[in-house]
């Protein structure tokens, strides 16, 4: 016998957890669509030369390649050493770049797309790291230009999604890479590659700590003078406490830098100010976002606004949603300039962390809302008719197809997480009613048959707001 098991790095859920996961997906999708984003799906595998155009190094080492057995045999016979023709996608950004470049002549710009699909990475097997996982992305792509106003709207989407998910108080940390790079210029760090390297180190502050990052910036090939490093670390420690405080800190940044401040710094401050102003207009409460000059995002293609979202009471979970603005999404695939802004929610990892922290307990029981008991074989037609009426009334209903002991049927409903159990014996049928047991409240009551579906619907709606 072969031992049944899954490969490491995948998240396989039992039905109750899968229901909770699916409901989170539904909330994310619903809010993406509410803001006018259109669904896109791309193939799970892409041509290797297309997928790997922008990657290299660590990314390429994590890619899963796809090869048919026939192609594999032919390659072995011929001694071919080149990469297989196909590879599984490792994120949704590169497929989006290919998609927009391929269809730019028919797409309407700005193109607002959402994509919720699995991606694959050859991660080292360890707790909390996944080789197959869901990403839930949105992006707004412009042609030649894209207004900074979309950056504010994206933050409003983040707020809408996590408000409805209801997984705890959260906060979006907001920054702009132009502010960071402009400040680095003011400290004498003017080389573009060195700036990117410094930003990657700043992005590691939470994981490595200030002392470790300071030592790295002063030595290890960076060679930045200690005084400038102290200025940089002091600058990135800036946090706002309110909307007004954020605007005041931006004003102070320009005043402190003087009339000769670098253009990039001034541009970044202006963009942040506009985003903050519009976020306020969009109705995002000021406690839901903060200005944080340490947010850099490690990916080099971000050029402006950057976001990171975290749960206030569970900081150990880390970022639950991140993203930012980029200047040219598809420069490897088209000569058109396609700037954009977007975010990604890594739902598989988020769900695993929430479950691990005990935050998913009781979130979902079953997608089945009612079960009809089969009293005996003679009442099968009646049980099926009750179930039919419930389904017509919008109640997800299961029927017991075998006349087992009633106690056994109740045990099944309880174990399956079904809230309502409906039964109709001879007495109930004679009086035109059904008996309903609410397993959640541990109450039993009778309902006229014609009112059964509407009554259960009211009970379910009330449970949503409790």
UniProtKB/Swiss-Prot annotation:
GO CC annotations on file: cytoplasm
GO MF annotations in UniProt: ATP binding; histidine-tRNA ligase activity
Main EC class the enzyme belongs to: ligase
Gene Ontology biological process terms from the UniProt entry: histidyl-tRNA aminoacylation
Enzyme Commission number(s) of this protein: 6.1.1.21
The keyword Acyltransferase belongs to this UniProt entry's keyword annotation: no
Reaction equation(s) it catalyzes: tRNA(His) + L-histidine + ATP = L-histidyl-tRNA(His) + AMP + diphosphate + H(+)
Record note on quaternary structure: Homodimer.
Protein family membership: Belongs to the class-II aminoacyl-tRNA synthetase family.
Name of this chain's protein: Histidine--tRNA ligase
Native organism: Xylella fastidiosa (strain M12)
């Amino acid at each position: 016998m072969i031992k049944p098991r899954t490969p490491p790095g995948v998240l396989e859920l039992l039905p109750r957890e899968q229901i909770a996961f699916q409901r989170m997906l539904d909330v994310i999708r619903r809010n993406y669509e509410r803001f006018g984003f259109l669904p896109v799906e791309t193939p799970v595998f892409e041509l290797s030369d297309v997928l790997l155009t922008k990657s290299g190094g660590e990314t390429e080492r994590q890619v899963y390649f796809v090869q048919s057995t026939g192609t594999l045999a032919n390659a072995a016979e011929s001694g071919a050493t080149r990469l297989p023709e196909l590879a599984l996608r490792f994120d949704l950004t590169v497929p989006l770049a290919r998609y927009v470049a391929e269809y730019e002549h028919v797409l309407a710009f700005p193109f607002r797309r959402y994509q919720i699909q699995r991606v694959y990475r050859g991660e080292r097997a360890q707790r909390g790291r996944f080789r197959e996982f869901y990403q839930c992305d949105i992006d707004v792509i412009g042609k030649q230009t894209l207004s900074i106003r979309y950056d504010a709207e994206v933050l409003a989407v983040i707020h809408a999604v996590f408000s409805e998910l209801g997984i705890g108080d959260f906060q979006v940390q907001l920054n702009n890479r132009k502010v960071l790079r402009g400040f680095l210029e003011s400290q004498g760090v003017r080389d573009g590659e060195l700036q990117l390297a410094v930003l990657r180190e700043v992005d590691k502050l939470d994981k490595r700590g200030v002392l470790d990052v300071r030592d790295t910036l002063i030595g290890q090939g960076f060679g930045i003078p200690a005084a400038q490093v102290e200025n940089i670390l002091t600058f990135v420690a800036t946090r706002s406490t309110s909307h007004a405080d954020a605007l005041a800190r931006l004003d102070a940044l320009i005043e402190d830098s003087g009339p000769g401040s670098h253009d990039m710094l001034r541009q970044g401050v202006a963009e942040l100010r506009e985003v903050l102003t519009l976020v306020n207009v969009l109705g995002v409460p000021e406690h839901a976002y903060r200005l944080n000059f340490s947010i850099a995002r490690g990916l080099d293609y971000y050029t402006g606004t950057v976001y990171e979202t975290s749960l206030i009471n569970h900081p150990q979970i880390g970022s639950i949603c991140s993203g930012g603005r980029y200047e040219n999404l598809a420069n490897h695939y088209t000569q058109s300039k396609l700037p954009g802004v977007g975010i990604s929610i890594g739902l598989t990892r988020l769900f695993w962390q929430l479950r691990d922290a005990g935050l998913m307990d009781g979130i979902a029981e079953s997608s089945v809302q009612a079960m009809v008991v089969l009293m005996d074989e003679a009442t099968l037609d009646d049980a099926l008719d009750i179930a039919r009426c419930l389904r017509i009334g919008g109640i997800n209903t299961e029927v017991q197809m075998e006349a087992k002991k009633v106690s056994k049927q109740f045990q099944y409903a309880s174990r399956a997480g079904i809230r309502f159990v409906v039964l109709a014996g001879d007495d109930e049928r004679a009086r035109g009613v059904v008996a309903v047991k609410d397993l959640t409240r541990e109450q039993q009551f009778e309902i006229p048959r014609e009112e059964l579906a509407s009554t259960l619907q009211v009970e379910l709606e009330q449970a949503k707001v409790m």
